[in-house]
Amino acid sequence: MDPETRGQEIIKVTPLQQMLASCTGAILTSVIVTPLDVVKIRLQAQNNPLPKGKCFVYSNGLMDHLCVCEEGGNKLWYKKPGNFQGTLDAFFKIIRNEGIKSLWSGLPPTLVMAVPATVIYFTCYDQLSALLRSKLGENETCIPIVAGIVARFGAVTVISPLELIRTKMQSKKFSYVELHRFVSKKVSEDGWISLWRGWAPTVLRDVPFSAMYWYNYEILKKWLCEKSGLYEPTFMINFTSGALSGSFAAVATLPFDVVKTQKQTQLWTYESHKISMPLHMSTWIIMKNIVAKNGFSGLFSGLIPRLIKIAPACAIMISTYEFGKAFFQKQNVRRQQY
């Protein structure tokens, strides 16, 4: 895409239209990627049954959500028996025995957090990019890095307390009155900063991921357009650029993902047993403990499952988002012409 066309697109696509495009992309990404994680959780629960109070991470392709296992026998979706022999076998048996809707078990509650976070993130990124381009010039290579960092930092900061509250409601079955009491008590005892517990490892993972993702995405998209002799990227160019840049960022930030998951799980283990969280459980201490116990490779455990989840999620999200913006841009041009 040439600079002039890119500049026109930013001007002609309104923030509301960017929000609609990102919302559509978020929902579509969740619908396509969630079944992969549902099957993974069902297979894990079959091999290692989840007792009450046990934490597990559920992903809808946009965000990771910590869930706390409840009592309920075989009624709960992640505890249903299946006798699965593998991933494909699990897909077919879940559809045949439980209905195709079971592949999206647990999705609606997670969208309450994921969709607003994604809308904030993508809209802020585009708005910041447009602002920086107007100040620094169209070809400034640091723009995707700066915009990606600021947008992700803001989205994580806004959503972090809401995610803590959502998980507490899910694990303790609080009413809104009880939730208000819990939040008030927590703030009075530990201060407002306690609502952002778990924020640091999330920022350490998501902010570098965002910077690397957007920088590589813009570079790859431009390079593929030049190789194809195109001024504007096609759907497949956006899709490929998103998958490759997402995969690279996922590998580079995996150690922080491992730490974040472990810290979340430990937090709720302490919470469920009503034990005070040790003050020394910082991100760096957890990382050192992982290396001491499992070696340096322990920081890269779960690489393949993360890539299987991240690559398609990034590809679907960005290509849908760019397609939506292109659609709105054409509609805006037509309105100006008539």
Swiss-Prot record:
Any coiled-coil regions, as ranges: none
Domain of life per record: Eukaryota
Name of one Pfam family that matches: Mito_carr
Major localisation: mitochondrion
GO cellular component: mitochondrial inner membrane; mitochondrion
Catalytic activity: glutathione(in) = glutathione(out)
GO function terms (MF aspect): glutathione transmembrane transporter activity
Record-annotated membrane-spanning stretches: 19-39, 103-123, 142-162, 199-220, 239-259, 298-318
Localisation per UniProt entry: Mitochondrion inner membrane
Solcar repeat spans: 13-131, 139-223, 233-327
Gene3D superfamilies xref list: Mitochondrial carrier domain (1.50.40.10)
Record GO biological process: erythrocyte development; import into the mitochondrion
Keywords: Membrane, Mitochondrion, Mitochondrion inner membrane, Repeat, Transmembrane, Transmembrane helix, Transport
InterPro entries: Mit_carrier (IPR002067), Mitochondrial_sb/sol_carrier (IPR018108), Mt_carrier_dom_sf (IPR023395), Mtm1-like (IPR045315)
Family: Belongs to the mitochondrial carrier (TC 2.A.29) family.
Protein role: Probable mitochondrial transporter required for glutathione import into mitochondria. Glutathione, which plays key roles in oxidative metabolism, is produced exclusively in the cytosol and is imported in many organelles. Mitochondrial glutathione is required for the activity and stability of proteins containing iron-sulfur clusters, as well as erythropoiesis.
Protein name from the UniProt record: Mitochondrial glutathione transporter SLC25A40
Naturally occurring in which organism (per UniProt): Homo sapiens (Human)
Lineage of producing organism: Eukaryota, Metazoa, Chordata, Craniata, Vertebrata
